[in-house]
């Protein structure tokens, strides 16, 4: 019963055409991709209470206030999830979380698809920020 949520999420991902690169049911981690939609090495951590989704996007080589301001402003446009920074403050990651108690497939797919939309709309800016 403990891993039922994990198995359900995995089934939803497969039904939606995602490639599962890593499937570690013991640690409850999945790594998925669907490169045509901007999803590559997205990590999903499935606990009893929350689903965490993260994907590294780029590293800021020359950090400026303008770059961080742009990221924060773009967060407002992201339907699900947000830009976050790692401990160094240079690695930009997309992150979203969902409570698992009443989680539905459409919520998980909406969160993941939000990243695909973000990548499509913001690619040029992300490339510039990573220079």
What kind of feature is each model-predicted range?
Residues 117:
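Long, contiguous binding/interaction regions
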Residues 80, 84-110, 124-131:
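Well-ordered alpha/beta subsegment
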């Amino acid at each position: 019963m403990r891993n039922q949520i994990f198995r359900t999420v995995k089934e939803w991902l497969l039904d939606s055409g995602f490639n599962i690169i890593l499937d570690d049911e013991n640690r409850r981690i999945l790594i998925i991709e669907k490169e045509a939609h901007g999803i590559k090495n997205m990590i999903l951590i499935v606990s009893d209470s929350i689903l965490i989704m993260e994907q590294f996007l780029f590293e800021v080589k020359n950090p400026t206030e303008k770059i961080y301001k742009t990221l924060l402003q773009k967060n407002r446009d992201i339907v699900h999830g947000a830009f976050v920074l790692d401990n160094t403050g240079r690695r930009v990651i997309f992150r979203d979380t969902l409570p698992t108690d009443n989680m539905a497939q459409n919520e998980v797919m909406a969160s993941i698809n939000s990243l695909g939309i973000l990548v499509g709309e913001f690619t040029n800016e992300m490339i510039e920020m990573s220079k």
